[in-house]
Curated annotation (Swiss-Prot):
Cofactor(s) in the UniProt record: heme
Family (UniProt): Belongs to the cytochrome P450 family.
Coarse class of the protein's main subcellular location: membrane
UniProt gene name: tndB
Location(s), subcellular: Membrane
Purpose: Cytochrome P450 monooxygenase; part of the gene cluster that mediates the biosynthesis of talaronoid C, a fusicoccane diterpenoid with an unprecedented tricyclic 5/8/6 ring system. The first step in the pathway is performed by the fusicoccadiene synthase tndC that possesses both prenyl transferase and terpene cyclase activity, converting isopentenyl diphosphate and dimethylallyl diphosphate into geranylgeranyl diphosphate (GGDP) and further converting GGDP into talarodiene, a precursor for talaronoid C.
Residues the record lists as binding heme: 481
Consequences of knocking out this gene: Leads to the accumulation of talarodiene.
GO terms, molecular function: heme binding; iron ion binding; monooxygenase activity; oxidoreductase activity, acting on paired donors, with incorporation or reduction of molecular oxygen
Pathway the protein takes part in: Secondary metabolite biosynthesis; terpenoid biosynthesis
One Gene Ontology CC term in the entry: membrane
Name the record gives this protein: Cytochrome P450 monooxygenase tndB
Length: 485
């Protein structure tokens, strides 16, 4: 009897094992068939099937994933190689078209009154800034959210902010002067991150994070920005690139974003295990506290506009935006976008230019000569930004710095939701993400000879008008950078 029992148990174990193997095999075969079918559809029956480009890129997003995540942001250079092989229009993944033709730039990045324009939802997945104007997909909602911000960043708005910016610039000068002769090594990326962060902090919350008074200029902030840029690609590509898992993750939001994860972790614990997050956490709390206080103050629109130190969020709260658009959580995400974009890009460009000024004596001497008259009464009087705008060599240095430091190197996909885009003989279906990269336009050797060299003189005198055509550090159209002034 005991032997019969053992045989029965052995048979049952074998049956269960075979059953497990059988189920696994069925799942594996099913996934293989699904993936193969999806690849065949993308290669031969997809609306973009006829567009030039590598077949592997058309079949799967794993190709882009490899270059952007595994090889850490190299896809922008791989796309350049594709253009050399396949021409100005290419399909770089199953869903997206990239064009390298500066004459077509204004057809992709159009003004709001030309046609409706949306962003590609995948480009905001996982980043955690949903609800901000930058990450708003819908054309009309984006315009509503952006409209109250525009006067603040107009030329008139910048005039109002000028005294505050001068105040911060004087503080920066005082700090560096105080360190002169100390023998300390000062990292300019930390210095300019602190300066830009304090300026944008006052714009957003009327109270700066006070990084410039930090002994090391808040070096953890600069390090955090570097990490954020490096870590963005994995979260954008977090949803698997092909197959059944991709469909499931898109329908169930299986990959939570960083923002959601961070809000699930107690702040004290987060800062103990990840000190670099302190900078963003402090700014987020400053922004939330200020937004709550601004709502309580309930200032009139006239009072807000008269006060040169009013924050951008006082403008939003007193605008005609509905209450649903002025929720504290949404506005705090708007603050984080302004802080991130306003700090990182500004600091990088300033550091980039400063390096070339310090390492090229002839540039430094020429700039000093040009500044001598407008700085004659310093420190009692500083030149206005309108006076600085009239200095040709300074402006040439700024344009060259923006050309090579980049706001965003990679393409910024835009969608025409209603009508197809026509490029030469190609009709790009409505709803297709289409992008162009500043990197491609800014390094075109036919337009910018020796494109990777910092040559401010190329912008002086009578220069090739194509340089202005190709110069797009702030993008263009209805979704261009607010801070371009």
């Amino acid at each position: 009897m005991e032997g019969l029992y053992k045989e029965a148990v052995t048979f049952a174990d074998r049956y269960n094992l075979l059953n497990v193997y059988g189920i696994s095999a069925v799942i594996a075969v099913g996934l293989a068939i699904y993936s193969a079918s999806l690849a065949i559809y993308r290669l031969y029956f997809h609306p973009l099937a006829g567009f030039p480009g590598p077949r592997i890129a058309a079949a799967t997003r794993w190709y882009e994933f490899y270059y952007d995540v595994i090889k850490r942001g190299q896809y922008v250079y791989k796309i350049e190689e594709m253009h050399q092989k396949y021409g100005p229009i290419i399909r770089i993944n199953p869903h997206e078209i990239v064009i390298n033709d500066p004459d077509f730039y204004n057809s992709v990045y159009v003004a709001g009154n030309t046609r409706r324009t949306a962003i590609w939802p995948r480009y905001r997945t996982g980043i955690g800034f949903d609800g901000s104007h930058t990450m708003t997909e819908n054309h009309e909602l984006h315009r509503r959210r952006r409209k109250p911000l525009e006067p603040f960043f107009s030329r008139m708005g910048i005039d109002k902010m000028e005294p505050m910016i001068i105040e911060e610039a004087k503080l920066l000068n005082d700090r560096l002067t105080g360190l002169k002769g100390s023998g300390n090594v000062i990292r300019l990326d930390h210095v300019f991150s602190a300066f830009a962060g304090d300026v944008i902090g006052r714009i957003c919350s009327e109270s700066p994070p006070d990084m410039m008074n930090h002994p090391e200029f808040g070096k953890e902030w600069s390090a955090q920005f570097d990490r954020e840029y490096r870590e963005t690609a994995p979260f954008v590509h977090a949803r698997p690139a092909t197959g059944l898992v991709s469909s499931l993750s898109q329908s169930t939001s299986a990959c939570p974003n960083r923002d959601r994860l961070a809000r699930m972790i107690p702040t004290g614990f987060l800062l103990r295990v990840y000190p670099g997050a302190a900078g963003f956490n402090v700014f987020r709390q400053l922004a939330i506290s200020h937004i709550v206080d601004a709502k309580k103050d309930n200032f009139s629109k006239e009072k807000v506009e008269k006060n040169s130190k009013s924050s951008v969020f006082r403008y939003i709260i007193t605008s005609e935006m509905p209450a649903s658009e002025c929720e504290t959580e949404r506005l705090s995400r708007e603050a984080m976008v302004l802080f991130g974009a306003g700090t990182a890009t500004t600091a990088r460009t300033m550091g980039f230019m400063c390096y070339y000024i310090l390492t090229n004596p002839h540039m430094r001497e020429r700039l000093a000569d040009e500044l001598r008259d407008v700085m004659a009464d310093y420190p009692h009087k500083l030149p206005s930004w309108q006076e600085l705008e009239r200095l040709p060599y300074l402006q040439a240095m700024i344009k060259e710095g923006l050309r090579l430091s980049y706001g965003v190197m990679r393409r910024l996909p835009r969608i025409s939701p209603d009508i197809p885009l026509v490029y030469k003989q190609w009709s790009i279906p409505a709803g297709t993400p289409v992008g162009m990269a500043a990197y491609s336009l800014h390094t075109d050797p036919e337009v910018y000879p020796e494109p990777f060299k910092f040559i401010p003189e190329r912008w002086l005198g009578k220069y090739d008008s194509r340089m202005d055509r190709n110069w797009v550090p702030f993008s263009r159209g209805s979704r261009n950078c607010l801070g371009m002034k």
